[in-house]
Amino acid sequence: MNNIAPQSPVMRRLTLQDNPAIARVIRQVSAEYGLTADKGYTVADPNLDELYQVYSQPGHAYWVVEYEGEVVGGGGIAPLTGSESDICELQKMYFLPAIRGKGLAKKLALMAMEQAREMGFKRCYLETTAFLKEAIALYEHLGFEHIDYALGCTGHVDCEVRMLREL
């Protein structure tokens, strides 16, 4: 009898070969929540199919979660465009339904914020939408506080929930 244990999810840095897979995850999760490209959500970002190129720049980092050979989620950090140089943004945190509830988003967010600290950032900002209740609960648990105004120039005009955390 051959008992092969299922693989554990692996968190690793984004590679060029991951571009199509992580774009697919972001589009699928966005569709699940009704976050359409005609509005100011991540799914409308012009660089969605080129995330490796974006996150290979200094001050940027992105990780994917791979499970049984498939990319099932990801998230990253980048300097907050149009804001103070000590503020980064937690970006593009998306996970397929089958992998949610396993603590991976929390682990990834903590890892990203630690990397941001090491890069010299002092604060971490994020934008999301009220449709993503589970994500908001996670961010609150991680110490993010709601703020009443947008920071920077993210282009995500329909993301009405804005949060900030000291690193």
From Swiss-Prot:
Enzyme class name: transferase
Does this entry carry the keyword Acyltransferase? yes
Please name the Pfam families in this protein's record: Acetyltransf_1
Lineage: superkingdom? Bacteria
Q: Which keywords, in A-to-Z order, does the entry hold?
A: Acyltransferase, Transferase
What Enzyme Commission number(s) appear in the record? Answer: 2.3.1.-
Gene Ontology molecular function, alphabetical: N-acetyltransferase activity
Show where the N-acetyltransferase domain sits: 9-167
* Annotated family: Belongs to the acetyltransferase family.
Task: Return the protein name.
Answer: Uncharacterized N-acetyltransferase YjgM
Q: Which source organism?
A: Escherichia coli (strain K12)
